[in-house]
Every structure is written in C-alpha cells, then in structure tokens.
A protein has these predicted regions:
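ABC-family ATPase nucleotide-binding domain "signature/switch" substructure
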Residues: 132, 155-220
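Short hydrophobic beta-strand immediately N-terminal to the Walker A/P-loop
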Residues: 34-36, 48, 216
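Helix-to-loop junction immediately C-terminal to a conserved catalytic motif
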Residues: 52
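A short, proline-enriched helix->beta-strand linker immediately N-terminal to the Walker B motif
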Residues: 147-151, 180
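Conserved ABC transporter NBD signature motif
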Residues: 60-71, 75-76
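Conserved beta-strand
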Residues: 9-12, 19-29, 60, 170
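ABC-family P-loop ATPase nucleotide-binding domains
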Residues: 82-140
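Walker A (P-loop) phosphate-binding loop of ABC-type ATPase nucleotide-binding domains
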Residues: 39-43
Length: 231
C-alpha cells in the first residue's frame, strides 16, 4: 500500500555555532504542492539540505518517498528533482546539447516539455551555459527539473532571480506538469507560494503555522504579518 505522505519529517534538528534548527516536524501529502517560507535565517535551506542528505542532521528522522535515509537508493533519487539557487551545468554545453545528455540519463525525459519550456522562458537553445546570466541559469535548471517528470520536486529559492512574468510561467508550469505529483517550494517571497495547497511557516521555534494562503491570512499570525509587510 502506497504511503499517504511523500515526505515525513519528525524532530529534525541541526545545530551550528550560531543557529539551531530545533526539532521541526511536518508531513507533505503525496500529490500536493507545498510552500515552505520564513524570514532569512529561519532554516529553510538547512532543512531541505538535511532532507536530501546533503548535510548530517543531529537528531530526528526523515522518510522521503517511503524510504528512510538508510534505505535511500539511486533508483529513488532518480525520482527526485531538485533546483537550488546556484544550480550548475557544464559551461561549454548549450540547452540543445543538454537535451541529448539528459535523454541518456533519465528514462522519463520529455524533450517536448523541455523545448516548450525553453521557448516559454525565452531561453536560446544554442547559447552556451557559461554565457547565461543568473536568471537564465535558474530558468534552465527549472526547465530541466520539470522535463524528467520527477515524482518529487524541490525548488529552493529557485525563482528568486526571475522577473514577475517568468516566475508566473514557472508557477503555472509546476501546477500543470506536477499534477498528481509532489512539489515543495522554498521561498522568501510569499507571492511564490500563494497558490500552494499547503504553506508551512518556519521560524526560530520550528513550524509556527500551516495552512492555505486564505487560511493563514484569516488566522492573522506570522504569515499574515509577513504578507502585510510585503504589500
């Protein structure tokens, strides 16, 4: 029987000299689009890095796509798409050449989706990656992540360098292409996650509140305060 949650985080703790991610717990239901927000330094990226096994946690347990950290294998990792602020590709390759590379790497690679996204995001197919601006690099990273039909997609501040129009194209593409799959968007701008099924607000005391955009505004807590500041 397939588990109801794509991600289960229980008591995740990571301590640095001047910062502690302190026993945070949350679940991400399968097939949902979830936002994780919080002020700078709240630990959003630290949490995601621990979930992906990129840093060693100090305490807690994590289950991703039904696998614990110890059970995680290459086949499961190939079902996960990740876009970080600063994602990189070989500088000498163009998006057109990258298409050939990813056709070999991903069994589920969809070049029709890929080239459609390149066009929508105004990315040149023949230009080398090393000649791309930061915003163009982020657009390409997102196009790649969405084109191999990840079962679980994580975007960590992936749209922070994009203009409003490009961000809207990306958000609409996520909603369309990830239908029935799971996506987690880590963001500082609330506009990035307003349409998410569920939003988690991370603070220095862990998950402060959760709910939809409308529910959190009605509650009048930390999310509503951040929303008012951004208006």
């Amino acid at each position: 029987m397939m588990e109801q949650n794509a991600l289960v985080v229980d008591g995740l703790t990571k301590q640095y000299r001047d910062f502690t991610l302190d026993h945070i717990s949350f679940c991400v239901p399968r097939g949902s689009i979830v936002g994780l927000i919080g002020e700078n330094g709240a630990g959003k990226s630290t949490a995601i890095q621990a979930i992906l096994g990129l840093i060693q946690k100090d305490a807690g347990s994590i289950s991703l796509l039904g696998k614990t950290e110890e059970e995680m294998d290459a086949a499961t990792r190939n079902r996960i798409g990740v876009v970080f602020d600063g994602s990189n590709f070989p500088g000498a390759l163009s998006p057109d050449k990258l298409n050939t590379v990813f056709q070999r790497i991903y069994e589920t690679w969809d070049e029709d989706v890929y080239f459609s996204l390149l066009e929508q995001l105004s990315l040149p197919k023949e230009k080398k990656f090393k000649e791309f601006s930061k915003g163009m690099r982020m657009k390409l990273s997102i196009a790649v992540a969405l084109s191999h039909h990840s079962e679980f997609l994580i975007l960590d501040e992936a749209t922070s360098a994009l203009d409003y129009v490009s961000e809207q194209i990306v958000q609409q593409s996520i909603e369309r292409l990830m239908k029935g799959r799971t996506a987690v968007t880590i963001a500082h701008r609330l506009s990035t996650v307003q349409n998410a099924d569920r939003i988690f607000v991370l603070g220095d005391k862990g998950i402060l509140e959760q709910g939809s955009h409308a529910e959190l505004l009605k509650k009048g807590g930390e999310y509503a305060k951040l929303y008012r500041i951004g208006q």
